[in-house]
Amino acid sequence: MHDAQVRVAIAGAGGRMGRQLIQAALQMEGVVLGAALEREGSTLLGTDAGELAGAGHSGVTVQSSLDAVKADFDVFIDFTRPEGTLEHLAFCRQHGKGMIIGTTGFDDAGKQAIKDAAQDIAIVFAANFSVGVNVMLKLLEKAAKVMGDYTDIEIIEAHHRHKVDAPSGTALAMGEAIAYALDKDLKDCAVYTREGHTGERVPGTIGFATVRAGDIVGEHTAIFADIGERVEITHKASSRMTFANGAVRSALWLKSKGNGLFDMRDVLNLNEL
């Protein structure tokens, strides 16, 4: 399917997701691990990336400077923090590198910076790189078109204790998919907190609830509730390799693109369904 190999660089190589991405890159056919990055001053600098990820010797040492490895990769994969990702984005735009962005928690200015950069480089920007989650998003659009006008819609998400943003990017993507199907703007209909005497539920709103506990990888449920029945659409992840494999698969797909902003629905061709 892919005539040429794609060389990838991994940001945050020492993190939980970074190590999974390194494993996925080393295991996936057609992909070469070209570089692995960590922050300046990290004790992991100079270590072998494959050994760091528990995947054996790779011959790629962890570096702190993108400039030092700019000749070693075609696509940069970033699941770090918004401020770091935006710095990497500027570098990739300047040097014509494709980018896979799985970082969540961007404000409107950050999202606009990604859109602007996509005029010059190819970017896959997704809240979740799991195949199953993206199929779920498509199912939510279909369900919302049929049931969304007369049901109460709630989104519940659960993640591990270390996750720093809430609601999760995936939960927000679920809300956006539902709102899009109903010709609404999520900003106008989302309810993120309920406390005290809230009064009755406002019709047409989309509620969000967040759980942070233990080592939960990721669980998301959308509820369409009517009187007498409800439909629940749920996705549960048991391993971060699901996300890592999707991200690396996206890098393969992105290799042939010159510029533009894409998401996993483009990669999986779900927009044709």
UniProtKB/Swiss-Prot annotation:
Q: Which domain of life is it from?
A: Bacteria
* Keyword Nucleotide-binding on entry: no
Which residues take part in binding (S)-2,3,4,5-tetrahydrodipicolinate? H160, G169, T170
Give the species: Enterobacter sp. (strain 638)
- What residues does NADP(+) bind to? R39
Listed transmembrane segments:
none
Gene name in the database record: dapB
Q: Name one GO molecular function term.
A: NADP binding
Cross-referenced HAMAP family: DapB (MF_00102)
Q: Which residues form the active site?
A: H159, K163
Keywords on record: Amino-acid biosynthesis, Cytoplasm, Diaminopimelate biosynthesis, Lysine biosynthesis, NAD, NADP, Oxidoreductase
Q: Provide the assembly information.
A: Homotetramer.
Q: What is this protein called?
A: 4-hydroxy-tetrahydrodipicolinate reductase
Q: Tell me the InterPro entries matching this sequence.
A: DapB_C (IPR022663), DapB_N (IPR000846), DapB_N_CS (IPR022664), DHDPR_bac (IPR023940), NAD(P)-bd_dom_sf (IPR036291)
